[in-house]
Amino acid sequence: MTDTEMNDRRLPVGIQSFEVIRKGGYLYVDKTDIIWRLANRGKKYNYLSRPRRFGKSILVDTLRAYFEGKKELFEGLKVMELEKEWTCYPVIRLDMSCGGATPEELNSYLDDAFYKYEQKYEVAVRPEASLAVRFQNIIETMFQKTGKQAVILIDEYDSPLQHSWKTPQHDACTAIYKSVFAVLKKEDEHERFVFITGITKFTQISLFSVLNNLSNISFDAPYATICGISKQEAADNFIPEIEAMGEENGWTPEETLKQLTAFYDGYHFCSDNMVDIFNPFSLINALEDRKLRNYWASSGATSLLPKFVDDMEMKMEYFDHCFIEGDTLETSDVVNGGAELFLYQSGYLTIKGYDDGVYILGFPNFEVRKALYRVVVPALTMKSNSEVVSAQSFLRKMMQDGNTAEAKKALKALIADVPYSNKKMASMDMEERYRLIMSTIFRALGFRVEVERMLATGRIDMIVEVPSFIYVLELKLSNNGGISAAESQIKEKSYTEPFKADKRKVIALAVELDETGKGLIDWKEVDESL
């Protein structure tokens, strides 16, 4: 492909308007056959949960264009083989991510949104009319003036509820929801199709308590790929971009796709159709920049974690292979469903397997794993984020360069006094505390870490892999022999032997730790040949 042809290919970075994508000549992964089936399956009320930045808004906007009968935008897409009538319906679209986190902000957004529809359809409004009455009048007037039932699209319905959760504002926001969205059931005869997207499920609001016939398609196999990009779709639509990214980084196209898969793929949304799904936001940005970066996390994806997950820094290993009842995952309220449910709905965990009514959950990919570990390091080390970032950046560089003397200084600074001072670890023995802290720090750097690897000769405390080196760490407390005992064990058990075939240099480290929890005392490179 020539440079000119490549420049003509436009990736839709940050664009959530279907019309802009189609008229602007941006690349579009065609989901319109799935969207058509959703719109015409005979279910009036539909709900879809997907993580943030996962393509829900462009899905909603595509539905709007379809129901508004904008046939010209769909030329060349799969829906053209399916839709024959292209009926134009009146459409209400509400983007609740604009609704703020207080009742005042929520009222203001709905007031403004309803005003625009009142102006468009010339709805008579009494000054004292409530938001619920105005919503009802809009739906009825649409029907009266067009002769067509209304289509109602509510995007990111839970955003104000998430952001107000655990604040004094939450109950007032919930009351507004109950009042306004109870209208959906009252106006059933005037509605053609209602589609609601969100991340987390708050069942105490009327969307779920009143709409008892609300169809949750979040776990339905036919809609598993309605958001996101499958590996096949990536190969079908983005080969030139994959090749260009590979050329810039010295990878073959196959290696590039493998890297993208490790970083951004791995989502599954049902037990029957375990197709790997890329996070579309991260994939598109990576192809645009031709870099592997943490796009999803840097967009604010981790900001709500402290509200919904307590003591997460102590539970990371558990979350990477945890179990949850099918009924809990599919139907429970996020408020009462536990940390696993929130982490799944928010995209931090995904379905890894299913057995006898129980889902197995784990981290979907490298980007999410690294992002979560970076979030918990300040809490675990009891240091400010700025302190952690500075020390971690230096530690990463030194570990990647094989400079163990300088790496030791950075690690000392990060874990000084932590095992002693962090009372959440009181039930753990001292060596276990050090293993948790050190493995979390290394994982937050994006290194591959394995704890307590079993060999025929013994058990390696920790293995840390970086691009050019493999570090084999044996940890010993000062009152248990310290560096001398750790060095002897590495040699006697031949701990570096399993890695001799690897092209990377293997560095064995005998690590001495203070038995009272004051931190790293010293470490020493071990030469097994001596």
Regions found by a protein language model. Give the residues of each.
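Metal-dependent nuclease catalytic cores in nucleic-acid-processing enzymes
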Residues: 180-187, 341-349, 439-444, 489-509
